[in-house]
Swiss-Prot record:
Induction: Expressed in the late phase of the viral replicative cycle. InterPro entries: Poxvirus_F11. Belongs to the orthopoxvirus OPG055 family. It comes from the Viruses. Stimulates increases in peripheral microtubule dynamics and may increase the motility of the infected cells, contributing to cell-to-cell spread of the virus. Seems to inhibit the signaling via the GTPase RHOA and DIAPH1/mDia. It comes from Variola virus (isolate Human/India/Ind3/1967) (VARV). Keywords: Late protein. This is Protein OPG055.
Length: 354
């Protein structure tokens, strides 16, 4: 006689197995993803303040950093020469429009979805480029401008007009978001090359339909004065650096002439029996003496200018300035025949550091 399990008990057992298998298959990471998304959203900026009077456009400056090499690597290595040169009174820079996918700009978008990327531009600054007065205004007057440093081989700085935000040396990845109506003043570029990505953030249709208040922007007069003084200081620094480069190139040429004259005099003495013209030797020696006097004068003047540059350049920027000066001197086209003798006496082997 077999053992018979009641039907009700069978159903209970089947139900329990089904319930336990459902527990085993429950997808828990989804909850974690929701939490992660919420955390990422809260980390974002908020450009609108919700008050009893309604939505008010904020006038804060948002400063952060991002990894630009992975996001914008193609723009950093782009050597195309399709920038448009803007060379006006007190303003020199190169600019071109670019298309950037919205997903790469997620870090500068607001958490509430009130603003969207509209236009993007690349701004390139070379040595001496920048603004001594005025600022660059792009985008919607009721929007925001994100300024992202993609590359900086020199000493690059910027000032957000009317605020206390004055950066004397921007690093790669530095990001500043400010009201578009303030503009961005790029300080004069010292050495090297810098590339900035400018992103215009405009109000979305949702925000426009909801409505918002645009308050008057505040103004920091002390910061304006400080920015003006800094601009003049950078202008003087660039002038002295250009003078150092000029002196360096002249020294290269003077050393070259000295080496050639000394070598020529050596052969004159070596073949004294053949070359009997003592006047030629005297002329060569006279030229050598003049060249050495010029070298001594140039070295003295160079030392004076180096002291001036040291007093103007921040200590942490001296290596950047030194590398730029040395590179410019080595790229001098005045001395084409660089043999072993000339190179051993060239300025690149002197202690030319600040």
């Amino acid at each position: 006689m077999g053992f018979c399990i009641p039907l009700r008990l069978k159903m209970l057992k089947r139900g329990s197995r089904k319930f336990s298998s459902m527990l085993a298959r429950r997808h828990t990471p989804k909850k974690m993803n929701i939490v992660t998304d919420l955390e990422n959203r809260l980390k974002k900026n908020s450009y609108i303040e919700n008050t009893n009077q309604g939505n008010i456009l904020m006038d804060s400056i948002f400063v952060s950093t991002m990894s630009v090499e992975t996001l914008f690597g193609s723009y950093i290595t782009d050597d195309s020469d399709d920038y448009e040169l803007k060379d006006l009174l007190n303003v020199t820079y190169n600019i071109k429009p670019v298309i950037v996918p919205d997903i790469k700009l997620d870090a500068v978008l607001d958490r509430d979805g009130n603003f969207r990327p509209a236009d993007c531009f690349l701004v390139k600054l070379k040595h001496r480029d920048g603004f001594t007065k005025g600022a660059l205004y792009l985008g919607h007057s009721a929007g925001f401008t994100a300024t992202i440093c993609l590359k900086n081989e020199g000493v690059s700085g910027l000032y957000i007009p009317g605020t206390s935000v004055i950066r004397t040396n921007i690093c790669q990845g530095d990001t500043i978001v400010s009201r578009s109506s303030r503009g961005v003043q790029f300080l004069l570029q010292i050495g090297g090359e810098a590339i900035f990505l400018i992103v215009s953030l405009c109000p979305t249709k949702k925000l426009v339909e909801t409505g918002f208040v645009i308050p008057n922007i505040s103004s920091n007069d002390n910061a304006k004065i400080a920015a003006r003084i800094l601009s003049e200081k950078r202008k003087d620094t660039i002038t002295h650096i250009d003078t150092l480069i000029q002196y360096g190139q002249q020294l290269e040429l003077a050393y070259y002439n000295s080496c050639m004259l000394t070598e020529f005099l050596h052969y004159c003495n070596l073949y004294a029996n053949t070359i009997k013209e003592s006047l030629l030797k005297e002329t060569i020696q006279k030229d050598i003496n003049i060249t050495h006097t010029n070298i001594t004068t140039l070295l003295n003047e160079t030392a004076k200018v180096i002291k001036l540059v040291k007093s103007l350049v921040d200590k942490e920027d001296t290596d950047i300035v030194n590398n730029f000066i040395t590179k410019e001197i080595k790229n001098c086209g005045g001395v084409k025949n660089r043999d072993t003798i000339v190179n051993s006496l060239s300025l690149s082997n002197l202690d030319f550091y600040l």
